[in-house]
Amino acid sequence: MASKKVHQINVKGFFDMDVMEVTEQTKEAEYTYDFKEILSEFNGKNVSITVKEENELPVKGVE
């Protein structure tokens, strides 16, 4: 198998499709990323796309 070079970007936060932004909330600050600009780096390239949603599981006995 030939070697390969991987160009990968990971962004985690709340996605707003109307404005194509992802907002990441950390303990220190809030960061907003231009998702359309990020995707433009891959324009015309052969890509693999994965979208994942994460939710915390409810804890038994806690409301």
Swiss-Prot record:
Protein name: SPbeta prophage-derived uncharacterized protein YonK
Description of how the protein assembles with itself and partners: Octamer.
